[in-house]
Amino acid sequence: MLFALPALNDNYIWLYQRENLPLIIVDLPETDKLFAWLDKQNATIEAVLLTHEHEDHTQGVSAFKKRYPTVPIYGPQECEKKGATQVVNEGKILTAHYQIDVIPTGGHTKQHVSFLVDNHLFCGDALFSAGCGRVFTGNYAQMFDGLQRLNTLPDETIVCPAHEYTLGNLAFAETVLVEKSAVEKQRIFVETQRAENKPSLPTTLKLEREINPFLQAKTLEEFTALRKAKDIF
């Protein structure tokens, strides 16, 4: 089971469950909607994964810990001050039921990480559908290197970004990509989804390789120019 729970203005809390095992929760922007969903599902929780320190990903941590004090909360070093109980910057997490790969994807923040659970990539604000995160406390080289790491994953990888930014990203992609047919087709799909108040996500790495200009960038210089152009688009 994979579910994108809308939160705040345009965030998603991702919930992943293999068969009838306990849930994995990715990022905690808020808890009211999450607690209501968990109660309705009568769910048990294996772990929480935090991708980075920004408030719109962590401001629900305190309330979550009060309600679920024994659930481990994994995140990079920068998330320790936000309430993460287990620091992970790279490597593997082995829980009772899951093996989780931790992939460094800094740039948006210095220590941003992404998580690969089975074939599901939870990439926070590193990779979006048809886009990528802004560079804040990290740098362009970090962001480019992180996206290059993600770009080595298989086509069938299910990509689960943290924000509903797809339409705006597709609009930019149409202005910079030479081959636009896949972008135009995806834009029609996403417009239909959003008109029905449905998520445009998840996506796949196969599709992103066709519609995401940041994954097509071959050099740091090309990537940096694209990112700066998107910043003022």
Curated annotation (Swiss-Prot):
EC code: 3.1.2.6
Reactions performed catalytically: an S-(2-hydroxyacyl)glutathione + H2O = a 2-hydroxy carboxylate + glutathione + H(+)
Pathway field: Secondary metabolite metabolism; methylglyoxal degradation; (R)-lactate from methylglyoxal: step 2/2
Pfam family, one: Lactamase_B
Key word Repressor present: no
Keywords linked to the UniProt accession: Hydrolase, Metal-binding, Zinc
EC class of the enzyme, as a word: hydrolase
Cofactor remark: Binds 2 Zn(2+) ions per subunit.
Amino acids binding Zn(2+) 1: H52, H54, H108, D125
MF (Gene Ontology): hydroxyacylglutathione hydrolase activity; metal ion binding
Cofactor(s) listed in the protein's UniProt record: Zn(2+)
CDD domains: hydroxyacylglutathione_hydrolase_MBL-fold
Alphabetized SUPFAM superfamilies for the sequence: Metallo-hydrolase/oxidoreductase
GO BP terms in the entry: methylglyoxal catabolic process to D-lactate via S-lactoyl-glutathione
Domain of life, per lineage: Bacteria
Protein task: Thiolesterase that catalyzes the hydrolysis of S-D-lactoyl-glutathione to form glutathione and D-lactic acid.
HAMAP family assigned to the protein according to its UniProt record, in alphabetical order: Glyoxalase_2
Family membership noted in the UniProt record: Belongs to the metallo-beta-lactamase superfamily. Glyoxalase II family.
Subunit structure: Monomer.
Protein name per its UniProtKB record: Hydroxyacylglutathione hydrolase
Organism: Haemophilus influenzae (strain 86-028NP)
Lineage, highest ranks first: Bacteria, Pseudomonadati, Pseudomonadota, Gammaproteobacteria, Pasteurellales
Gene that encodes the chain: gloB
